[in-house]
Amino acid sequence: MSSGRIVQIIGAVIDVEFPREAVPKVYDALSVDGTETTLEVQQQLGDGVVRTIAMGSTEGLKRGLGVTDNGEPIQVPVGTKTLGRIMDVLGRPIDEAGPIGEEERMPIHRAAPTYADQAATNELLETGIKVIDLVCPFAKGGKVGLFGGAGVGKTVNMMELIRNIAIEHSGFSVFAGVGERTREGNDFYHEMKDSNVLDKVSLVYGQMNEPPGNRLRVALTGLTMAEKFRDEGRDVLFFVDNIYRYTLAGTEVSALLGRMPSAVGYQPTLAEEMGVLQERITSTKTGSITSVQAVYVPADDLTDPSPATTFAHLDSTVSLSRDIASKGIYPAIDPLDSTSRQLDPLVIGQEHYDIARGVQTVLQRFKELKDIIAILGMDELSEDDKLIVSRARKIERYLSQPFFVAEVFTGSPGKYVSLKDTLAGFKGILGGDYDHIPEQDFYMKGSIDEVIEAYNKRSK
């Protein structure tokens, strides 16, 4: 273990001078003497100087302070001892519940599984959310992205998915909070505690107020914990909220390291950094990682380089729409914009495929008719088109659903709808079985039985 000293501090970037024969390797962890600050080597500048990123605040550091090379990358605790605990980017507990007591630590930088080790599956993962199970079903061991602008419900959807899948699915989950609000992290912890699933979830937080080094590496910390569970032969759920903040932290670090920015000011290594993370989130022959990632879309522009780069790595994309949210339909998922590789008759079966495509066809036709309705009014439509509009409005409302995690805000109990009930409901609407029921009875209901019950109660 060699020793050096700090020669320059610029925000979160610190230059450290070492003897020329003992320069640390890139990604080695360094400890600043007399503090709890850890640095990670990013560049070797020559003459024994390395440029590092601080994993934590640089307040109180000054030139001349001694630094020790740990000789290895950042190591974090892994295994079952991490379950039920909240940790920071270095794997230190931040929940005031004593030491982790881990039996093993692993480096956060690892190679992705080789092509020969990877394994794909077509097994579906039921979420209990109608619109997702219908038009963009999730695969076990697949990658899912929740795309949406500010305030359309990414985190609420993520929390509902965690609640539904973590409770129905008996395996372990890892949640990485990357650059999100501390309040949301706190809410999430208590939500897990109240649902009695905290002992199956490892939580890793690097929140908005943390330096860019923490936000850049916290996703890798969470992923390392998930990889350990997978390599033990388990099926793991890995949740990331928010992958955009990971990119943003990379942009901040890149600028501080003096790299020339590329399109829209992002780092020139955007695709590579995203690939390094995403290629490790994969299923092997020993176990699977099913990942759900929230992706913030800046200014609702899906062509922005950050969400556009993320798209390439996903199996299912769930797109949240501000227009749907403005109608008061939650979850505000756009069934015409959301896609899944699983939406294939060979995977989900012909009946499910036909119902999903039927729903999308009716909604697409309704979208085309909106301009005519706005100019000429409903009366000018043919009888067939009037029927399509009527069914489309019912489908739109029936795609809404009360969430368990939103009970405290809405006052209405959450609903978990099985795939069988979801398909039966939409098949009935498309077949005209419920043409006599007014559209308001379809709003915020679970299964179709609740719609019929509400109609019968009102018509008495």
Swiss-Prot record:
Q: Example GO molecular function term?
A: ATP hydrolysis activity
- Which keywords has UniProt assigned to this entry? ATP synthesis, ATP-binding, Cell inner membrane, Cell membrane, CF(1), Hydrogen ion transport, Ion transport, Membrane, Nucleotide-binding, Translocase, Transport
Residues that hold ATP according to the record: G148, G149, A150, G151, V152, G153, K154, T155
Q: What class of enzyme is it?
A: translocase
Q: Which GO terms describe its cellular component?
A: plasma membrane; proton-transporting ATP synthase complex
Q: Which PROSITE patterns match?
A: ATPASE_ALPHA_BETA
Question: What's the chief localization of this chain?
Answer: membrane
Please list the reactions this protein catalyses: ATP + H2O + 4 H(+)(in) = ADP + phosphate + 5 H(+)(out)
Membrane association type: Peripheral membrane protein
Q: Which InterPro entries match?
A: AAA+_ATPase, ATP-synt_VA_C, ATP_synth_F1_bsu, ATPase_a/bsu_AS, ATPase_alpha/beta_chains, ATPase_F1/V1/A1_a/bsu_N, ATPase_F1/V1/A1_a/bsu_N_sf, ATPase_F1/V1/A1_a/bsu_nucl-bd
Q: Where in or outside the cell?
A: Cell inner membrane
Q: Which Gene3D superfamilies match?
A: 2.40.10.170, Bovine Mitochondrial F1-atpase, Atp Synthase Beta Chain, Chain D, domain 3 (1.10.1140.10), P-loop containing nucleotide triphosphate hydrolases (3.40.50.300)
Q: Report the EC code(s) recorded for this entry.
A: 7.1.2.2
Q: Key word Iron present in the record?
A: no
> Where, by residue number, does the polypeptide cross the bilayer?
none
Report the leader peptide range: none
Q: Which Pfam families match?
A: ATP-synt_ab, ATP-synt_ab_N, ATP-synt_VA_C
**Annotated family:** Belongs to the ATPase alpha/beta chains family.
Function of this protein? Produces ATP from ADP in the presence of a proton gradient across the membrane. The catalytic sites are hosted primarily by the beta subunits.
The protein's assembly and partners: F-type ATPases have 2 components, CF(1) - the catalytic core - and CF(0) - the membrane proton channel. CF(1) has five subunits: alpha(3), beta(3), gamma(1), delta(1), epsilon(1). CF(0) has three main subunits: a(1), b(2) and c(9-12). The alpha and beta chains form an alternating ring which encloses part of the gamma chain. CF(1) is attached to CF(0) by a central stalk formed by the gamma and epsilon chains, while a peripheral stalk is formed by the delta and b chains.
**Identification of the protein by name:** ATP synthase subunit beta
- Species source reads Alcanivorax borkumensis (strain ATCC 700651 / DSM 11573 / NCIMB 13689 / SK2)
Taxonomic lineage is:
Bacteria, Pseudomonadati, Pseudomonadota, Gammaproteobacteria, Oceanospirillales
User: Source gene?
Assistant: atpD
